[in-house]
Every structure is written in structure tokens, then in C-alpha cells.
Design a protein with these regions (language model features):
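Short acidic low-complexity segments
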Residues: 27-38
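Amide-donor transfer/coupling interface in amidating biosynthetic enzymes
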Residues: 68, 101-157
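Conserved Rossmann-like nucleotide-cofactor binding loop
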Residues: 11
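Extreme N-terminal starter segment of soluble prokaryotic enzymes
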Residues: 1-4
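Cysteine-nucleophile active-site neighborhood
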Residues: 48-117
Length: 157
């Protein structure tokens, strides 16, 4: 299996690579359009600011490459958010792969501090990605923004 991790100065690229190595998978980390297009699967990681990151993707000409991919793409953190239509972070137009808005948590409505940092339970699992993960499993989050729940959602927390 040929897995490409999109290289664009995302903060969690090495963590994703390390996780795949633990599974016996040797991914390629690349910003080369051809390598990304030829991969069986693509991982789009990310930690950062939506506006600055979108600008960087445009400069690298990866915005069009990502939008045109036909193989499975796993967006992680900001990578997932950038596949949506628009982010409130920097009032940023994103890749518009999914017609979803990325919104900032409203602090008045929450009993938590923002950014939300900590362990949450996964619920409503709707993807084969979670076949070996139990409902109510704990996962760690660090975020101030979220993708609206929609028909494209594969889990909630």
C-alpha cells in the first residue's frame, strides 16, 4: 500500500508518520503533486492557522492537487478543516471539498476553556476507520474550531 502524507509544514506530520511506522507502514512525506496523485491513499495532516496554511497550499499549488484527488484522503486536524468550504479562523475560503463551515467554539455556550484541550469520548462512529475502536473510546483533542456536524461526519465527540 502506497500512502502519501502531504508535506506543507504542518505541525503534526512526524506524529502521523510515526503512527504509521508503528503499524508497519512506510509512507512517503511529499509535496510533489505526482507522488500525491499516484498514492493509493493520502493523509492530509495539519496544525496551524487556516488562513496562513491555505495561502501556503496555494503557493505550493497543492490546493488544486488536493481538490482533484480521487483516492481516499484522511484529513487530520487542520487538514480536515481545510477540506471544508470556509473557516471562521481568518475568515478563510478553504478547499470546498465538503460544503461545511468550520466554526469557532462559542465560549459563552461551553463549560470548557478554549482552546479545548483534553480527552473526549468518540461517539456515533460511522466509518470503517473505526472498526477496531470501541464506541466511547477516549481520544485527545487540542482545538478551538470544529467542523459542523453533517452527512459527511464520521464521528462526534
Amino acid at each position: 500500500m502506497n500512502i502519501a502524507i502531504i508535506k506543507y509544514n504542518a505541525g503534526n506530520t512526524k506524529s502521523v508518520e510515526h503512527a504509521l511506522h508503528r503499524l508497519g507502514i512506510q509512507p512517503v512525506i511529499t509535496d510533489d503533486a505526482e507522488q500525491i496523485q499516484q498514492a493509493d491513499k493520502v493523509i492530509f495532516p495539519g496544525v496551524g492557522h487556516a488562513e496562513a496554511t491555505m495561502q501556503h497550499l496555494i503557493e505550493l499549488k497543492l490546493d488544486k492537487v488536493i481538490k482533484e484527488l480521487k483516492q481516499p484522503v484522511l484529513g487530520i486536524c487542520l487538514g480536515q478543516q481545510l477540506m471544508c468550504s470556509h473557516s471562521e479562523e481568518g475568515n478563510t475560503d478553504c478547499l470546498d471539498i465538503f460544503p461545511i463551515m468550520v466554526k469557532k467554539f462559542e465560549t459563552a455556550d461551553l463549560q470548557y476553556k478554549i482552546p479545548q484541550i483534553g480527552w473526549n469520548n468518540l461517539t456515533d462512529l460511522k466509518s470503517p476507520l473505526f472498526n477496531k475502536i470501541n464506541e466511547q473510546s477516549f481520544v485527545y483533542f487540542v482545538h478551538s474550531y470544529y467542523c459542523e456536524n453533517s452527512e459527511y461526519s464520521i464521528a462526534t465527540c
